């Protein structure tokens, strides 16, 4: 199982999936990121996180996720300007 997390400025969205299916998904206010939102019976193999809400939110979430004992990969969103002249 993979846990995919998108930390936005207002909402944080997450999805629990494998290579074929989505098993669970939800969202919560990013200001509540310090609460326990991630409790699963399934073994998590990897966590992938995209974050635009700043280092503090990332650090809090990192602490909350350490109990999964799996790799955590942070991907950096890229601004795209292809459609602007």
Predicted feature residues:
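Short amphipathic alpha-helix with an adjacent loop that forms part of the alpha/beta core around
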Residues: 34-42
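Glycine-rich phosphate-binding loop and adjoining helix at the ATP-binding site
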Residues: 46, 52-85
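Residues that cap or initiate secondary-structure elements
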Residues: 20, 34, 53-55
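Short hydrophobic alpha-helix segments
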Residues: 25-28
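Gly/Thr-rich phosphate-binding beta-strand-loop-beta motif of the actin/hexokinase/Hsp70
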Residues: 1-23
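Short, glycine- and charge-enriched coil/turn segments that flank and shape catalytic ligand pockets
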Residues: 20-22, 42-43, 66-69
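Short active-site oxyanion
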Residues: 1-3, 44-47
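Short, solvent-exposed coil/turn elements at secondary-structure transition points
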Residues: 20, 31, 78-80
């Amino acid at each position: 199982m993979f846990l995919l997390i998108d930390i936005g400025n207002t909402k944080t969205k997450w999805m629990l999936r494998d290579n074929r299916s989505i098993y669970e998904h939800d969202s919560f206010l990013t200001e509540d990121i310090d609460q326990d939102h991630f409790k699963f019976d399934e073994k998590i193999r990897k966590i992938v996180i995209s974050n635009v809400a700043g280092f503090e939110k990332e650090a809090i979430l990192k602490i909350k996720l350490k109990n999964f004992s799996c790799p955590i990969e942070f991907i950096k969103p890229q601004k795209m300007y292809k459609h602007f002249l």
